[in-house]
């Protein structure tokens, strides 16, 4: 499942942008929150689609990675999820940068993408961890009561 997800992300972020046309290098953004601010301004000016797709899309696309990592290793730590998510996103951004410099892609390296993608991974981690916690709590509450607790319920 993780391999299929990785291939899908690679296709979405790299392969879908490759064409036979030589492209100009777009550049890079190394200033944190600059792109996010510009998308928020677009949103405020009524450009809902572009702003939403870019901000929400960068987050949502990486939620499955956080989910999959927790499912593969239920004891994985938040810090490790953060590092894996950041590095996964960093590799994609570096590939986009290198392929853009070689005029194969017209994508850019954007530090805000690293932030948004990592947030997506962390949301996936928190979702699965939260659901697991609730399932355990419900299971414990319903099925693992002591005989004394069960007898008290019967008397009520």
Describe the predicted segments one by one:
Residues 1-107, 122-156:
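Bulky hydrophobic segments
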Residues 110-121:
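Membrane-interface transmembrane-helix boundary segments in multi-pass integral membrane proteins
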